[in-house]
């Protein structure tokens, strides 16, 4: 998305496929979150994420305007700390258990 660090759906899905493949080969870990940002614009959400997540975490948006975040090299044991930080910044977080296509909801 122009003016943000948020990837368009097609580019985000490419990154998600890559992370998923590496996880399947036991070469990397990640957690996928769907983020709601009820009191922010998309640009404000992007700015808040810049302060809350690491440089190597990947954000993307679906055609429906849903915001997703790939937390790279993260496992569930560290998730409570990350979720608390994001929720404190005004996000509503939903962990996605399976790799999903951000547009159709189909499993990859």
Model-derived features with residue positions:
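Regulatory and interdomain segments flanking nucleotide-handling catalytic cores
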Residues: 1-108
């Amino acid at each position: 998305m122009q003016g943000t660090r948020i990837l368009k759906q097609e580019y985000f899905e490419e990154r998600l496929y890559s992370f998923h493949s590496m996880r399947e080969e036991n070469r990397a870990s990640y957690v996928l979150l769907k983020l709601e940002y009820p009191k922010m614009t998309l640009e404000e959400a992007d700015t808040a994420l810049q302060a809350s997540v690491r440089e190597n975490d990947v954000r993307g948006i679906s055609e429906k305007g849903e915001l997703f975040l790939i937390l790279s090299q993260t496992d569930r044991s560290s998730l409570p700390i990350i979720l608390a930080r994001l929720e404190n910044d005004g996000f509503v977080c939903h962990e996605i258990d399976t790799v999903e296509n951000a547009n159709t909801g189909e499993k990859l």
